[in-house]
Amino acid sequence: MWIPAQIKAREKDMKAMGLQIPTDRIYNETGTALNNAVVLFGRGCTGEIVSPKGLILTNHHCGYGSVQGLTSADKDYFEHGYWANNMNEELPCKGLTITFIRRMENVTDKILTAVSDTMKDDRRDSIITKRIAAVEKEYATATHLDAMIKPYFEGNQYWVAITETFRDVRLVGFPPNGIGAFGGDVENWMWPRHTGDFSIFRVYAGADNRPADYSAANKPYHTEQFFNISIAGYKEGDFTMVYGFPGTTKEYISSYELKEVYAVTDPISIAARTRKLDVWTKHMHDSRDIFLKYTSKRASVANGWKKWQGEVLGLKANDAMGKKLAYEKGFQQWANKDKTAPFANSLLAEMKSATDAADPLIYQEQYNKEAVLGIELIQQGASLERLIACFRSNLTDSARVDTLRKVIAGMAWFYKNYDAATDRDVFISLMQMYFDNCAETMPEYYKTQFAKHEKNINYWAYDVYKRSMASSAEKLNSFAATAKAADSTKILEDPAWQLFDAINTVRQHRIIPALNAYYYQMHYLDRLYMKAQMVKDKSKIFYPDANLTLRLAYGQVKGMKPEGTAKYSFQTNLGEVVALDDPASDIFRVPKKLKDLYKARDYGRWGVNGEMPVAFLASNHTTGGNSGSPVLNARGELIGTNFDRPYEGTMSDYLFDPERCRNISVDIRYILFIIDKFGGAGWLIDENEHCEKVAMNYAFNNCSSPSLMMYKGEAIAFTY
């Protein structure tokens, strides 16, 4: 995950792997390189410009939130998709922004001058915060653009990004969930993968081609920098690059911090969510109504659950702890002898002492969050605080009733997708887990209630859900209808409120302050440890941990062999999609039109030897935030859009191993096929004037026995 300005130093390695263009074509500060075609999509995804008229390609799941604001019962874009027939039909997405990184510059000297390595963080942070504000203002004034400074290498370096954010972004194309979310949670974090995870937007600008608020008078943003599209394909071993905005990685932490992940937080989260998902799955199987209520929530909970399992698997299989300990042994030997970093000698011992003291708190807090606060009724107990606030105000009875009703109406989103009987069974399962593991540290209220209910969690659960007004919207509305000034006691006596208040009091007064002090201490130690590692290995070119800033990763198209005997291909195809079709399943139901196109093998110019590629694997280092990232070939041409990782390699957030870690991308040819043949929006493809020419030139120059591909009687590409 290299900072773009670093890649000049990586050029030899990149070319040895197959790069065919100069690195200054990938990044430069003149505005003529590929970095000017990569955008931060919204607040946490990546997108790529694919036409001179501001057309943006990103993931289906990145556009999901914006499309949700546009869809309705009579315009269900999730079920049917959406394809604009022209620019007039492109739909404004309120609140969605697109940010370009115009250039990046190392400003460490401006931020850290006269700031010592061992200066305590409170004083250090005060100085740095003031300097960042001043330097950002300086760059913004000079460039007439926005400037954002972020820390790198745990605060040992600072870089400024000169950015330009556009506020008028419109939906252009969005495949239905039967394509864009195909496979759902079942295929999430998995390979083989069959999801057409893409969507299309367009950025608009004012008359001066600069950012502007939405206006019907705005024009498509004009740019000379956009990605050429290659439909020539790829083969295993081909060079690839991924450009984007990876969110968070922690590759340089100590073994003590890594142990917290794979031995404490991940296992607890996995165990708690396994229990919750088991209960939800049973109830969803028994009731269609509950299935619909819990589908989205289940996907959200299962997302982390599956990722963490892969993370633990990968860390153990790759002996991540062994590698950390071996490195730390050498580090300590160096620190004992070398005087260039005098602060380094005691770092590992201090880290061990700090983590040893914090581990019991981290253990307890993870159970608090995943087990206790994993129960929806207890979460909802927090919302009762808003009702209590109504009684603290000096309101008349009628005004109080009206205010309570409005507050309760705001909770409708929760009760629309809530089933008390299902949650009661979750309570029984998770509370048993909590008592089995946290009996000594749990709130006293929990112990007394357990004893009061004859130490029978089932009995306790039935009583809680029977008595709590938070278990249904009807109970809350009934309470609000006749609420008097003295009725605040009814809320304070509600079991959901008491369960939440008890755990919240323990967390806020005992656990969170102590953990905040620990994290503050570790931030200081991590910064010094990162500094010492860079001093120790002066010849090594380090890349900083991800922090949602522009990065480039490179690797190769490469299949994988996960645990077991199965050897998977590096590519999937449409035939596999159709083979998975299940009309009774919300996540494996293939749209009829797509099945018809497959049956007729009507792939247009996008198919390859009678097949339609769908997704492929490569060994690029990615993480959250790389969703929607352009995947490029050796010539910097777009061959796909990144959207996921197989769970066997999710440990790459802590240890990247190119032999095990993979990124999953949707093939650009599948994207073009869906746009053209399924969506009937071929006019969008015409905007990328280089698409056909690039494919033909590559095939002609690189294939020993190319054959001509015909489309509508015209030669449009060579295949091989």
Can you name each region flagged by the protein language model?
Residues 1-720:
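Terminal presequence/propeptide segments associated with secretion/organelle targeting
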